[in-house]
Amino acid sequence: IYWYTATKQSDGSYAAQVNLKNHGYNYSTYNIHVYVTSSTQVKMVAGVTTTEVYPPAVNLKTELAADELTCNLTASNVKLSGGVQKVYFAVWSDNGGQDDLVWYEAQESGGVWKRNISIADHKTDGTYEVHLYAENSSGKRIFMGNTTFDVSSISVQKIQAKNVDAVNGSFDVVVSGFVSPSGVHTVQVPVWSKDDQSDIYWYTATRQSDGSYAAQVNIKNHGYNYGKYTIHTYVTAGNGVYKFTGSTSATINVPTTTMQVGIQA
């Protein structure tokens, strides 16, 4: 609370100028009470009112790079009573709540606050929340506005089990048709044959000349089990986004043998 003494105006009214510095530079709803002291020194309430004081609207923009590796954040018209000391962008993805929240300090140039962020700091696809905070001369961070941007998911068009070899106990997993603006960093292929996944083995696929990724599965990594194998694929994109991208299966049967019986006379 701060008590102001109003000054009489030429029209007979009284006026007082309120300054936010007297109230910790707080932006909020302000309560105003008017007290009048009579000529007999009696003080009484003459009226009450409220007014809302908030920062001016900011111009907050996001520009996601075509390869979705980075996103450029900018904010202009960032103004506070008492001046702006620092500006921060609080960024997180909707997927998983705020478990990937990062506070980025912006840099000012020509009245525009900027920060280029890496999607790899969050490793998530979907909608990203961007909240803007300005720090006043008292060190308090004040919310100024918010916006969003979207990072693409990852998908593949084909997951194939090829070259099933019962004799050598192996088959190839080929993953192709990647849809990922930031490219492909790694492709992992977990494979198992038992219902409880006790024989699961993770293979790292290798990039082929045609852009596909391939991994060779060998039953020696699965206790030499024969039968149906479940195959899943996980892709890490160039921007760190990690996604399950599909599944298939393959069957390795016990190799058949030929037995010859000869009867000697």
Task: Report the location of each language-model feature.
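Solvent-exposed loop/turn segments flanking beta-strands in beta-repeat/beta-sandwich domains
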Residues: 1, 27-29, 79-101, 178-201, ...
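Exposed beta-strand face motif in extracellular beta-rich ectodomains
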Residues: 26-32, 126-130, 225-231
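Conserved structural position at the C-terminal beta-strand
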Residues: 34-36, 132-134, 233-235
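Flexible, low-complexity linkers/stalks enriched in Thr/Pro that connect modular domains
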Residues: 49-56, 147-155, 248-257, 262
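Short beta-strand segments of immunoglobulin-like
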Residues: 59-65, 160-165
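Structural beta-strand segments of beta-rich domains
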Residues: 69-74, 169-173
